[in-house]
Amino acid sequence: MDKVLNREESLQLMDLLGLERSAWGNIPLMRKAYLKKCKEFHPDKGGDEEKMKKMNTLYKKMEDGVKYAHQPDFGGFWDATEIPTYGTDEWEQWWNAFNEENLFCSEEMPSSDDEATADSQHSTPPKKKRKVEDPKDFPSELLSFLSHAVFSNRTLACFAIYTTKEKAALLYKKIMEKYSVTFISRHNSYNHNILFFLTPHRHRVSAINNYAQKLCTFSFLICKGVNKEYLMYSALTRDPFSVIEESLPGGLKEHDFNPEEAEETKQVSWKLVTEYAMETKCDDVLLLLGMYLEFQYSFEMCLKCIKKEQPSHYKYHEKHYANAAIFADSKNQKTICQQAVDTVLAKKRVDSLQLTREQMLTNRFNDLLDRMDIMFGSTGSADIEEWMAGVAWLHCLLPKMDSVVYDFLKCMVYNIPKKRYWLFKGPIDSGKTTLAAALLELCGGKALNVNLPLDRLNFELGVAIDQFLVVFEDVKGTGGESRDLPSGQGINNLDNLRDYLDGSVKVNLEKKHLNKRTQIFPPGIVTMNEYSVPKTLQARFVKQIDFRPKDYLKHCLERSEFLLEKRIIQSGIALLLMLIWYRPVAEFAQSIQSRIVEWKERLDKEFSLSVYQKMKFNVAMGIGVLDWLRNSDDDDEDSQENADKNEDGGEKNMEDSGHETGIDSQSQGSFQAPQSSQSVHDHNQPYHICRGFTCFKKPPTPPPEPET
């Protein structure tokens, strides 16, 4: 260090560094002080520029001198100040030493391993050794035992590492300490080594690989999970492999992996859950979860199975009992149900693409007929008289009601562009929503609220994905005939959805967490109060039915509460019973005609035409539909009072039950009223058929009997 700087420079540098003189030569301490003073003297930090320059110059000179002094040949050079005075004996010695050769003939150079042994001095130099390429994968004999997943989150407890001999020896100790392995062994494999080890806890392959790669900067390393632990270890102990070392003397045995008394863990059958969802057509995750959890209890003492009221339960309880018991303890209940529901929706998507609309409607009718067989069967709780009463009430809602329903079904099946939507318009409590709800259940579909803001409307329209029809319920607008009607933006929104209503082009429908679905928007119904409809929207309706409130229908409902309590008049089954009662068998699809015939025969046996006409008579009179067996004087007085109220307009009630108008530019042919199989009765009789409706002319009241 004394030759690096002279004394004046060294003192000056130590003063600039702020160190004691005794610290001269302590390079780390001087380096730390230098970095600290650089921040202090730097001009950008407000320091002294001259001191900064002087300190940098001296420190750089000192640093270069230290590096030069540590060179191996330092001291083999001479300095001009060290040359003796010319002419003296010292100068002669120095001169002789300066001219002395470093290599003498008596010396021999050690031979190198890389030198050629050829005798000729003109022989070809030796070729460079070729670098051996690193293997790309484990030996082929072991591939069947390994997992080949690359980007998997699966966790394992058994791994294998393929690397060089040197790194394998290092990793053997490092992995044993890092993961507290249960067992580890090192094996020879084609000039390389393989590590096989078991961990007490499960890890991802990527975690093991990342740790091992830190210790193998240049050496190759391949890390994989092991699927077949014992087969892998057994193969590593046989040729062409061999054991170098292992943590357990004697290694592993087969019974270490397959204990004799091990019990097989029973797994939930996802397939059975999916089959149940498909058979019941359940597309609600939570509903499916709740129904399947009910199967975990014994079916022998199940009240639902004893009563046999719910076919979705008692038909499947015994079959799914064992699987549901395992399902109840599963941690993936919702995931299993979600997959089952997705399968149901996928089947529905396939049907919407592959089946015709007529086939889809036929399948819907089959489902309704199955429900009717259960409802009105021996174990069912439904009363067919009440449902036929609902048919009688619905048939009085509009003239030729069965033909209206038949026309609507044809319109939905044909699905002709710009001739796909019906408009139900009328005041409050006129029957619009009742009929729309029944038609919706008859065909299958969804009801949509179009009165929402535009930013929420897209997701509301997404509900229509893969549906047979939709109902835009209670659409609000502006400029209604009555000032009491609330205003809304529903009609304006519908006017902006002309391409949806037309059905000429496919539109994009979206749901949350799902990709957009491009399809023809389904046809359907629009219900509204007496709002004004713009011409651009009116042109999208093939038929408009104007509803009017009718007092006799309202009074009949008040006296027949079961029609509303059991939602009979809003049910598609009531409309299907109406079609079975009124329409000929030939108008139904051929595949269900046999079932229609069976139901026609059953209705003929259980209901005569006179009984049905009594029901319609009671509807027109505004009394209870099933109140035709009245014997008390009070009931006779009530009936007479209702008859007097309707005496002047008995037939008018039926004639004014509603009227329908077709769109001028898009008219649709109407169907003739069905011809009844019964003969036309005389007008003098109390109940008979007259132009498809009941002529309600009561016979003259007999004179009172004289008192005795």
From Swiss-Prot:
Keyword Phosphoprotein assigned: yes
EC main group: isomerase
Domain SF3 helicase: 400-560
InterPro entries: DnaJ_domain (IPR001623), Helicase_SF3_DNA-vir (IPR014015), J_dom_sf (IPR036869), Lg_T_Ag_polyomavir (IPR016392), Lg_T_Ag_Polyomavir_C (IPR010932), P-loop_NTPase (IPR027417), T_Ag_DNA-bd (IPR003133), Znf_lg_T-Ag_D1-typ (IPR017910)
Record's subcellular location: Host nucleus
Region feature (Disordered): 109-134, 630-685
Phosphoserine sites (modified residues): 106, 112, 120, 123, 639, 676-677, 679
Binding-site list for Zn(2+): 302, 305, 313, 317
Chain positions found as N-acetylmethionine: 1
Binding region for DNA: 139-254
PROSITE patterns per record: DNAJ_2 (PS50076), SF3_HELICASE_1 (PS51206), T_AG_OBD (PS51287), ZF_LTAG_D1 (PS51341)
The protein's assembly and partners: Isoform large T antigen forms homohexamers in the presence of ATP. Interacts with host HDAC1. Interacts (via LXCXE domain) with host RB1; the interaction induces the aberrant dissociation of RB1-E2F1 complex thereby disrupting RB1's activity. Interacts (via LXCXE domain) with host pRB-related proteins RBL1 and RBL2. Interacts (via C-terminus) with host TOP1 and POLA1 allowing DNA replication. Interacts with host TP53, inhibiting TP53 binding to DNA. Interacts with host preinitiation complex components TBP, TFIIA and TFIID to regulate transcription initiation.
The protein's name: Large T antigen
Organism: Simian virus 40 (SV40)
